[in-house]
Curated annotation (Swiss-Prot):
The lineage of its organism: Bacteria, Pseudomonadati, Pseudomonadota, Alphaproteobacteria, Rickettsiales. Gene3D superfamilies: Ankyrin repeat-containing domain. Keywords: ANK repeat. SUPFAM superfamilies: Ankyrin repeat. It comes from the Bacteria. ANK repeats lie at residues 82-115. This is Putative ankyrin repeat protein RF_1158. The keyword DNA-binding does not apply. Coiled coil: none annotated. The keyword Ion transport does not apply.
Length: 148
């Protein structure tokens, strides 16, 4: 879209609050920018968890921009080599109890982390999770069969 008249027309439509079409060149660029912003937010959220930055974690969670149970699809390779949730990363790193308790209090699902630890045969992670989330003890027998 290099035609100045088309660009001017588009600007006028946008200024009037009309004409947003996600399939148009500008619309698709805006949609792509939103997707990249979301990806950056998720990567930053996991970075905050890895660095134990509780204030930054709170910022992401309180703004509601992040699903607290989203999986990190690009593992950093520091501790885990498989995708896992923020809670799984926090536990695997031996993160501060304050961070772990905050994640749990704000909806982090311990069963997801438990399943991730089971898949990677991370017994230390499983045991740590059971200490932190005692309700997981009831699930322990079912999930401890690591051959399934």
């Amino acid at each position: 879209m290099n035609d100045p008249k088309q660009i001017e027309k588009l600007y006028k439509l946008i200024a009037a609050g009309e004409g947003f079409n996600p399939n148009s060149p500008l619309g698709s660029m805006m949609v792509e920018t939103q997707a990249l912003t979301k990806k950056f937010a998720v990567i930053s959220f996991f970075g905050a968890v890895e660095k134990r930055e509780l204030d930054m974690i709170k910022t992401f969670v309180e703004k509601g921009e992040i699903d607290i149970n989203v999986k990190n699809l690009v593992p950093q390779g520091l501790i885990l080599t498989r995708p896992t949730t923020a809670l799984g990363i926090a536990i695997a790193q031996g993160n501060s109890e304050e961070v772990i308790k905050y994640l749990l209090a704000n909806g982090a699902d311990p069963k997801l982390a438990f399943d991730d630890f089971k898949k990677s045969a991370n017994i230390d992670g499983i045991n740590q999770l059971i200490k932190i989330a005692p309700d997981m003890i009831a699930c322990r027998k079912k999930y401890m069969n690591l051959n399934n």
